[in-house]
Curated annotation (Swiss-Prot):
Subunit: F-type ATPases have 2 components, F(1) - the catalytic core - and F(0) - the membrane proton channel. F(1) has five subunits: alpha(3), beta(3), gamma(1), delta(1), epsilon(1). F(0) has three main subunits: a(1), b(2) and c(10-14). The alpha and beta chains form an alternating ring which encloses part of the gamma chain. F(1) is attached to F(0) by a central stalk formed by the gamma and epsilon chains, while a peripheral stalk is formed by the delta and b chains.
The organism's place on the tree of life at top rank: Bacteria
NCBIfam families assigned: ATP_synt_b (TIGR01144)
Localization in the cell: Cell inner membrane
SUPFAM superfamilies referenced in this protein's UniProt entry, alphabetically: F1F0 ATP synthase subunit B, membrane domain
This protein's encoding gene: atpF
Organism: Pseudothermotoga lettingae (strain ATCC BAA-301 / DSM 14385 / NBRC 107922 / TMO) (Thermotoga lettingae)
UniProt protein name: ATP synthase subunit b
InterPro entries: ATP_synth_B-like_membr_sf, ATP_synth_b/b'su_bac/chlpt, ATP_synth_F0_bsu_bac, ATP_synthase_B_chain
A GO MF term: proton-transporting ATPase activity, rotational mechanism
Topology term for the membrane: Single-pass membrane protein
Residues annotated as transmembrane: 8-28
């Protein structure tokens, strides 16, 4: 019987071992595998999410870079346009100043010409008066030759001084 006992003990031990394996599998190993699977799925999900966010961040970075370049080009265009407008304004001011200077110069020339004509008319008038006065004196015979010259020189000197 010792042999059978041993055999029965071995079978009971084997049966206890199998029950223990079943209990361990059911209550420890299977939940552990489920937790490990969930953990693996979460890690994969987090990795996929991180890759997606990285791609989005790179796209946003590219968009920001493009927007910055566009803003730079726009600013350069605005600055260039402002420079051109300022040059146009300066050129217009120069042209206007030249025109004004020409007007002032022409006005001054016209005024000088008018005063010159007036002076010539005044000289002609005076010369006529002098000639008449001189002729009267000569006709009257009042002046002798020397007095006539002195009188004439006197009158001409006075006219030059005016």
């Amino acid at each position: 019987m010792g042999f059978v006992e041993l055999n029965l003990t071995g079978i009971i031990q084997l049966l206890n071992f199998l029950i223990l394996l079943f209990v361990l599998y059911k209550f420890l190993y299977k939940p552990f595998l489920q937790i490990a699977d969930k953990r693996r799925e979460k890690i994969q999900s987090d990795l996929a999410s991180a890759e997606k966010e990285l791609k989005e961040a790179q796209e946003m970075k590219k968009q920001a870079h493009d927007a910055l370049e566009s803003a730079r080009k726009s600013a350069d265009g605005i600055i260039s346009e402002a420079r051109q407008k300022s040059e146009e304004i300066i050129n217009q001011a120069k042209v206007k100043a030249r025109e004004e200077a020409e007007k002032v110069l022409n006005s001054a020339r016209n005024e000088i010409e008018r005063e010159k004509k007036q002076a010539l008319q005044e000289i002609e008038k005076r010369a006529g008066e002098i000639a008449v006065t001189l002729a009267l004196k000569i006709l009257q015979g009042v002046l002798d030759e020397k007095a006539k010259r002195e009188y004439l020189i006197n009158i001409l000197n006075k006219e030059k001084e005016k």
